[in-house]
Design a protein with these regions (language model features):
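Sequence signature of WD/YWTD-type beta-propeller architectures
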Residues: 1-268
């Protein structure tokens, strides 16, 4: 048994994942230090950290947190969860809940999928006592709405993602897509029932592309979630609305998994 990190100041840690390549790094959830009645562990009050087995740097923040408007691109605004390294260990994916939207109303705090890329470290002005810096540039890669239109591809939750292939996947035209993530998304059927299906997001090769703003602000606003970068869009892979037993199972809870070649996704 080996202790790699011990939380202090009333914080707690958990849900560790390990980098698939050297150097050995452990990524895990870190709850807030000095929790109080206003700010304690919750879906929207947690961050990701990394401990490097070969370096004595303690826990290094993955995601920065920006809680004062105007919000900062590359930082997020709340809670990250289940941080999974890419097959080459250069970046991570995770699920995300937003503090600002939670304060606006629980229905607006939809779970999403985000990514941390090694574009640059993000420094935050720290105008709020719960703001902090992060070593990775983080953005959302999924888009949700509070109330999906019945029978549409709109979702109100994105979760339980996976990296596609060890080197991405081969598209129908024979070209290679280097980076992609699949996730489960909750749609609403024409009859008004929740149906969980699988969605795919192709990601850019150039990390700088994650900093390019699209139609909506990367950093979010006081009334909107942070948005994916320019050109990042989710597509629906499965549509099970009309099956006798529609949807991906939520119980037992599980995460999607890709074949090494990226030509298949396993799910229940």
């Amino acid at each position: 048994q080996q202790i790699i990190y011990t939380a202090t100041q009333g914080a707690h840690v958990g849900v560790a994942t390990i980098s698939p390549v050297a150097p050995v790094r452990y990524a895990f959830i870190h709850g807030p230090e000095n929790p109080d009645d206003l700010w304690h562990y919750d879906f929207h009050h947690r961050r990701g950290v990394i401990v490097n087995e070969q370096e004595d740097l303690g826990a290094v923040n993955i995601d920065a947190c920006s809680l004062t408007s105007p919000y900062q691109a590359g930082a997020l605004r709340g809670g990250t969860h289940v941080h999974v390294f890419s097959p080459d260990g250069t970046r991570l994916s995770f699920t995300y809940n937003d503090h600002i939207m939670h304060e606006l109303g629980r229905e607006f705090d939809q779970r999403n999928v985000a990514i941390a890329v090694p574009l640059k470290a993000v420094k935050v002005a720290k105008k709020h006592p719960r703001e902090y810096d992060g070593e990775y540039f983080c953005t959302l890669i999924s888009q949700t709405v509070a109330y999906p239109q019945k029978g549409s591809d709109e979702i109100n939750k994105a979760y339980e993602e996976c990296w596609i292939g060890k080197q991405g996947y081969t598209k129908a035209d024979g070209s290679q897509q280097r980076w992609a993530i699949a996730f489960i998304g909750d749609t609403v059927s024409e009859s008004g029932e929740k149906v969980a299906d699988i969605f795919l997001v192709d990601l850019p090769d150039d990390d700088h592309a994650f900093s390019l703003e699209g139609d909506k602000p990367l950093a979010g606003t006081e009334t909107t979630m942070p948005a994916p970068a320019q050109g990042i869009e989710q597509i629906r892979l499965t549509n099970t609305h009309h099956r006798k037993y529609p949807g991906v199972l939520n119980q037992p809870r599980h995460w999607l998994r890709s074949s090494p070649q990226g030509d298949a996704i396993a799910f229940l």
